UniProtKB/Swiss-Prot annotation:
Activity: how regulated: Inhibited by phosphoramidon.
Top-level taxonomy: Eukaryota, Metazoa, Chordata, Craniata, Vertebrata
Cofactor(s) this protein cannot do without: Zn(2+)
Amino acids binding Zn(2+): 720, 724, 780
GO molecular function, one term: methyltransferase activity
Glycosylation sites: 279, 283, 324, 384, 429, 496, 652, 745, 753
Transmembrane segments: 179-199
Localization annotation: Golgi apparatus membrane; Cytoplasmic vesicle, Secretory vesicle membrane
Known EC number: 3.4.24.71, 2.1.1.-
Protein's job: Converts big endothelin-1 to endothelin-1. May also have methyltransferase activity.
PANTHER family: EEF1AKMT4-ECE2 READTHROUGH TRANSCRIPT PROTEIN-RELATED, ZINC METALLOPROTEASE FAMILY M13 NEPRILYSIN-RELATED
UniProt GO BP: brain development; cardioblast differentiation; heart development; methylation; peptide hormone processing; protein processing
Name the record gives this protein: EEF1AKMT4-ECE2 readthrough transcript protein
């Protein structure tokens, strides 16, 4: 059977075969490429994927010759190979492909003649072509021999070692033409290759060799130039100056409500994980890693999931006692349903219960209870009903549709779901806003279970917590930390005055919300309609494998991290990162010594806390020890044929893990993020900063990039997390991670004065006419400002020790200016208006634009290096500074 992929209509052929060698023919052929479907010569990637994949590695640098209007390069990316450069004779089709795949930054597109490739020798590990050499053959006298002009240039750009590695196997199996078709390797399309000759002349004329002309420097210079908007003055709007080009080149991908550096890097990490999990030769000595593959494959079994439909959830609801929306239910079982929904299946109706370090005694774990129970992202969506009418209507439609899919009747389902929504609105009314919960000293309340029972008597707390933490034995004297006593008291009163049928509907609705992502496409389609209203996503085209990677990361993230780290993480990165943290910590402590508002006793305690901050880089050590890794997931049963059951088993397993933690001290090996995560965090109860392997990559960090970019990228992230130890919440914890007052009153008053300046500054910023909440974002804004200052001071210290760096070619920036541009370009972002609104009401971070503008307008160093005068938009003349 012929293997043909979906293609556009076949274009007209040239009058003579030799026309295939003429660029004019190809330019004319591809005039409509930007608006047409891909066209595949011979067949698509699936036709030869099985032949090719055994020869590829996730980090191979791949060059695709004569890419044309084919989807091959994108399909290779989706197959788990992110580093792909594509060239074509036609500048018309190259422009079209750049536009079509602008949302995938690791796909690079260049206009080149394959007979004269402009890449340095050894640039690629794999070279692929599908029909390009056929075009060259139209001018050959012998149709079985490719002239040296094509083969030699391919041989030259291949990595020699990589070519030899595969030659012994391939030469015996394939002809010369097939060998080139099978191909072998890439890293780097130099985006400024057109300038290489001129730059080389300049280099030889300059005896100091002050311009860096390495491949890495040329490539990163090209990326920086692509992102800049030179039409905007840096003193007018530095975010637009730094990111205007990036924003033009990065329209929102379908199905996304936001797109930024973090999303892009996570997509790359996911592609690597996909390749690892779908490897047909997968073989591991770790049972946890084998569970990871089984879980992932169960998620991919779409036919099985569709076949089961809604039945798994219907059976579960019947097992719990029924749901008033869909049929008979047990009217006297509120506690039993609550225990099942919140205990066995870990949903969070009314409140959330978890085990974590006691903030006031951080060497021990304790039961903690906090507010919860709302499905929409924020209480604001429920309370401002006029402004959010579309969202509330879409949410009710979603509730009704799911109720109907599970067996509800048209005449009653909407009314019963409306009652559940009204209950959530009442919950929203008593939910405390996030900006009023920032003082942890005020919201922390330790009490016994007996005291909790007196506070919120509508349910039996000892019975509930004993079930939740079984087999542990609890008594009335067991300590519990409650965050928000007023909330729990009012929740208890709300439960008492609500009809049992509405309580049942609400509890089961919480279970339905948690489990429908494991069901068939009808439930996914229903959710997509709600997400379109809530976040502005136009349509979802997320491949199933990406959804399954995310699910696997949630379920078995550290076993998945073991695979990721072994495949990608350079151990030297850990040493380099630790060195950078030391430099940034030293810069922060030096700045502490110059703070005029802080008394000496508080300053000394702050220095001791900074010294005591423990840094965790890359991954926790246990993930590379198979037995230790297996022990972490011991007891979690995973099969390859039931994704829904795997998810139920996960909820039950996580409840057991939580119970197991209560009588144990907190462990430093217990990370809150998996190694592949593109993020970082500070944990006050451990006084530690954590930088997973996933973020120790470009654009945050690359070993052969200028230090200005590394300090402006990962350096600012490090400074940000370190400064969290001293933001409005972190500063309440001492060096041991305990919540206690350690500041002198005079310094505390001065601190609050300085942070009030930050709060007021950010409260003036607006997005689509809506003001930021400077109180809600205060901690992150303090960390952004302090992190930038610490990283820049660390960079200056590095320069004093090592001397000035070479400058990047063509960008026209000093290295000091480059530091600030590098920082800003980390935050280049696009977002729908709906998603922007959601961020304003839920996110403790300021929007990306103001993380740049707010921070840099407070930086004397930035204002000096860019010469921004007082009165310019970037220099109001009033600087807010805490650290």
């Amino acid at each position: 059977m012929a293997c043909l992929g979906p293609s556009a209509q076949v274009p007209e052929l040239p009058e003579k075969n030799c026309g295939y060698r003429e660029v004019q023919y190809w330019d004319q052929r591809y005039q409509g490429a930007a608006d047409s479907a891909p066209y595949e010569w011979f067949g698509d990637f699936s036709c030869f994927r099985d032949l090719l994949e055994p020869e590829l590695r996730p980090l191979d640098r791949i060059l695709v010759l004569g890419c044309g209007n084919s989807a091959l390069s994108y399909e290779i990316f989706l197959g788990g190979f992110p580093d792909v450069t594509s060239v074509d004779y036609s500048s018309v089709v190259v422009a079209a492909m750049r536009a079509r795949y602008a949302h995938v930054p690791t796909l690079r597109w260049e206009t080149m003649d394959v007979r004269a490739l402009g890449f340095p020798s050894g640039s690629f590990d794999v070279v692929l072509e599908k029909g390009t050499l056929d075009a060259l053959l139209t001018g050959e006298q012998d149709p079985w021999t490719v002239s040296s002009e094509g083969v030699h240039t391919v041989d030259q750009v291949l990595n020699e070692a990589g070519f030899r590695k595969r030659t012994s196997r391939l030469l015996g199996l394939h002809t010369q033409l097939e060998l080139v078709l099978a191909g072998v390797s890439l890293l780097l399309a130099a985006l400024l290759l057109g300038c290489l000759v001129a730059l080389g002349v300049q280099y030889h004329r300059d005896p100091s060799h002050s311009t860096c002309l390495t491949e890495a420097c040329i490539r990163v210079a090209g990326k920086i130039l692509e992102s800049l908007d030179r039409g905007v003055s840096p003193c007018e709007d530095f975010y637009q100056f730094s990111c205007g080009g990036w924003i033009r080149r990065n329209p929102l991908p379908d199905g996304r409500s936001r797109w930024n550096t973090f999303n892009s890097l996570w997509d790359q990490n996911q592609a690597i994980l996909k390749h690892l999990l779908e490897n047909t030769t997968f073989n591991s000595s770790s049972e946890a890693e084998r569970k990871t593959q089984r879980f992932y494959l169960s998620c991919l079994q779409v036919e099985r999931i569709e076949e089961l439909g809604a039945q798994p959830l219907r059976d579960l609801i019947d097992k719990i006692g029924g749901w008033n929306v869909t049929g008979p239910w047990d009217q006297d079982n509120f506690m039993e349903v609550l225990k099942a929904v919140a205990g066995t299946y870990r949903a969070t109706p009314f409140f959330t219960v978890y085990v974590s370090a006691d903030s006031k005694s951080s060497n021990s774990n304790i039961i903690q209870v906090d507010q919860s129970g709302l499905f929409l992202p924020s209480r604001d969506y429920y309370l401002n009903r006029t402004a959010n009418e579309k969202v509330l209507t879409a949410y009710l439609d979603y509730m009704e549709e799911l109720g109907m899919l599970l067996g509800g009747q048209p005449t009653s389902t909407r009314e019963q779901m409306r009652q559940v929504l009204e209950l959530e609105i009442q919950l929203a009314n008593i939910t405390v806003p996030q900006d009023q919960r920032r003082d942890e000293e005020k919201i922390y309340h330790k009490m016994s279970i007996a005291e909790l029972q007196a506070l919120a008597p509508s349910m039996d707390w000892l019975e509930f917590l004993s079930f939740l933490l079984s087999p542990l034995e609890l008594g009335d004297s067991e300590p519990v930390v409650v965050y928000g006593t007023d909330y729990l008291q009012q929740v208890s009163e709300l439960i008492n005055r609500t009809e049992p049928s509405v309580l049942n509907n609400y509890l089961i609705w919480n279970l339905v919300q948690k489990t429908t992502s494991s069901l068939d496409h009808r439930f996914e389609s229903a959710q997509e309609k709600l997400l379109e209203t809530l976040y502005g996503t136009k349509k979802s085209c997320t491949p199933r494998w990406q959804t399954c990677i995310s699910n696997t990361d949630d379920a078995l993230g550290f076993a998945l991290g073991s695979l990721f780290v072994k495949a990608t993480f350079d151990r030297q990165s850990k040493e380099i990162a630790e060195g950078m943290i030391s430099e940034i910590r030293a810069a922060f402590e030096e700045a502490l010594g110059h703070l005029v508002w802080m008394d000496e006793k508080t300053r000394q305690a702050a220095k001791e806390k900074a010294d005591a901050i423990y840094d965790m880089i890359g991954f926790p050590d246990f993930i590379l020890e198979p037995k230790e890794l297996d022990d972490v997931y011991d007891g979690y049963e995973v099969s390859e044929d039931s994704f829904f059951q795997n998810m139920l088993n996960l909820y039950n397993f996580s409840a057991k893990v939580m119970a197991d933690q209560l009588r144990k001290p907190p462990s430093r090996d217990q990370w809150s993020m998996t190694p592949q995560t593109v993020n970082a965090y500070y944990l006050p109860t451990k006084n530690e900063i954590v930088f997973p392997a996933g973020i120790l990559q470009a654009p945050f960090y690359t070993c052969n990039h200028p230090k200005a970019l590394n300090f402006g990228g990962i350096g600012v992230v490090m400074g940000h997390e370190l400064t969290h130890a001293f933001d409005d919440q972190g500063r309440e914890y001492d060096k041991e991670g305990n919540l206690r007052p350690w500041w002198q009153n005079e310094s505390l008053a001065a601190f609050r004065n300085h942070t009030a300046c930050i709060e007021e500054q950010y409260s003036q910023y607006q997005v689509n006419g809506e003001k930021l909440n400077g109180r809600q974002t205060l901690g992150e804004n303090i960390a952004d400002n302090g992190g930038l200052k610490a990283a820049y001071n660390a960079y200056k210290a590095w320069l004093r020790k090592h001397g000035e760096e070479q400058q990047l070619p063509a960008v026209g920036l000093t290295n000091h200016q480059l530091f600030f541009v590098g920082f800003a370009q980390v935050w280049c972002s696009v977002r729908t208006p709906e998603s922007s609104h959601e961020g304003l009401v839920t996110d403790p971070h300021s929007p990306a634009r103001f993380r740049v503008l707010g921070t840099l307008s407070n930086s004397r160093d930035f204002l000096r290096h860019f010469g921004c005068p007082v009165g310019s938009p970037m220099n109001s003349g009033q600087l807010c500074e805490v650290w």
